[in-house]
Amino acid sequence: MSKQNKIIGIAVILTLIVAGVVYGISSNLKHNEPVKTTQEDKNQDVILSLSYDKEISEGSQEEIVIPVKLSYLPSGVFPSASMSVEFDKDKLEFIGVKKGTMQDYSKTVPEWTFDVDASNKSGVVNAIYIDKSGAKNSYYKSGFEKGKKDVVLNLVFKLKEEAKSGDMLNLNISDAVFATVNGDTDNSNLSTAKNTMKNKNLILEVR
């Protein structure tokens, strides 16, 4: 199976998981009302971005911590989310994920699920978040504040010996979804595939 087919397959599986969780939470919520889109929501572009502003030197063994930031979170309940980030597995080693700063309804920072070994084999970090509490641990607008509470999670890498000075290492968000309770009916899901959320990728330069 080609790398592209694997990515497509994983994306389909994650989408089905997200859809199933959203359906389950939707069925159990006491106040399952349509998302009320505000004028601010309509005027704002939602961008999921990778960023890193430190110098990376050849041979360095320091952790490379890359924040995954959201530019804006619209009104609504977001009980599940997923993202796939491609990286150069020959020159970068994926170490894991550290918590971000975005909070859920309970004012805690959600923990995402990921597989280090599978990521390093495929060159794709697949991370997923599912709220199993019935919405109290879902992402809400109140848990987002640009510049303070806008980091969804942090991806952690290390350089491999194969990475040399002058190398340009691409990290690309190939797919990402923040699913709402009623996303299938009111089109409120944030999705890079549906262009309701944009992505900003990253190039790391080895000095």
Feature-to-residue mapping (PLM):
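Acidic, low-complexity intrinsically disordered segments
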Residues: 2-207
